Amino acid sequence: MQLQFLGTLASSEKRKKSQRLFFKNIKSTKNKAGKASIMSSDTNVNKSASPTATAEEQPVEPDGPLPGSDNNQEKKVRLSPAKMSTKNSTDLVEYVDKSHAFLPIIPNTQRGQLEDRLNNQARTIAFLLEQAFRIKEDISACLQGTHGFRKEESLARKLLESHIQTITSIVKKLSQNIEILEDQIRARDQAATGTNFAVHEINIKHLQGVGDLRGRVARCDSSIVKLSGDIHLFRQEHRQIEKAIQEFVPALETLSKNLDMKVMQLLGKIETASSEQTSNLKMVQGDYRHEMNLLEFKFHSLSSNLYEEVENNKKWTENQFLKYRKDHLGHINECLKVLQEKLEKSENKMEEKLLQLSSKVENFINTQKQETQLSKVKHMENKLSKKMEQMEKQIWGELETMQNEYQSGFKSIHDSLSSLQQIQKTKMDLEKYKVQKDLKKLQRKIVELQEV
């Protein structure tokens, strides 16, 4: 049994030496200062075990007095399987957080964390190795002191088995952690190579982009020069158009003033003609009254009716002229000339017809007798009424034609003026639209240049 135990201890020592050689390069100067704190934490963890563990920590009393000194007994009491349980020994090992993924470029904080983890693992390994050597020494002392007793052998076997299990589990976990760290280091190296390659490609693209931007800047400069020349030409054209408009405005004002003067003159002529016409009508009526005293009773009604109708026509014509004057003061030049000519012709015709009638009446009065005068007067009254009706119809027709001609002439003048105004407005709108388009294009190109 002792040979088997010593063989297991030798194999464990070989493993420990190989692990020590592997981790000697990783240890730093901080490990020595942290050993005391780790050992104290381990003892505190072992002390904070369950009540069952404290009960098991009590030494097992042998059947008889054991050989050896009191120091050997103290060592036996110190070496109990509960104190060397696998739970408390494995609690010292720190596991790597597998959920944390490595980034392509590891910052300084992550490197510090990796170094801290490696340092902590090295500390735990050193502490566990020291604890294993102590256990080996305690077991050898226990075997020397408890030679020949079965209970102590069984306790030693249990103790060895438990410690061998803890050591194997710790070694397995440490190997797993080492493999994980190696994988992480490889991933970090691959990410670093990838980032270097990406940076090289980005530099190449950046140089290409700078060359393209220089070409674009040169093109933009040439386009800006062209646009500045176009803007200068547009400004000159705009100034010329403004000058033409300013020259055209006073001409229009003079034309409107001339039209107003002509309209006023025509209105004065129309008023004088109407006053002359009324005076002539009054003279004709007075002559008829003096000459036709005999036919006063029968002809009075007709003359009064004619007088009233003529006055109504006169008022109606005056009202019509006033309305047209208020509505269309600036656009009746040609129509008023035609109206004046027709009025003069109608006045001449009326005067001739009145003279003819007066001569005929005088002839009838002189030639016929008083008996035949009544019949002739009746006949003449009928003829006069018919002729007056014809004259009224002719006057009304001429007035309607004059009104239609006046309205058509005014409409043509109004349409021509409105068409001129629309043409001017459309020209101004087109010029404004062109200038706004050019300004928008310039603003867009300036914004693009600023973005570049």
UniProtKB/Swiss-Prot annotation:
Transmembrane segments: none annotated. Disulfide bonds: none annotated. Residues 1-11, 38-55 have a biased composition (Polar residues). Residues 164-192, 329-452 form a coiled coil. Residues 1-85 are annotated as: Disordered. Keywords: Coiled coil. InterPro entries: FAM81. GO terms for cellular component: nucleus. Belongs to the FAM81 family. This is Protein FAM81B. The gene is FAM81B.
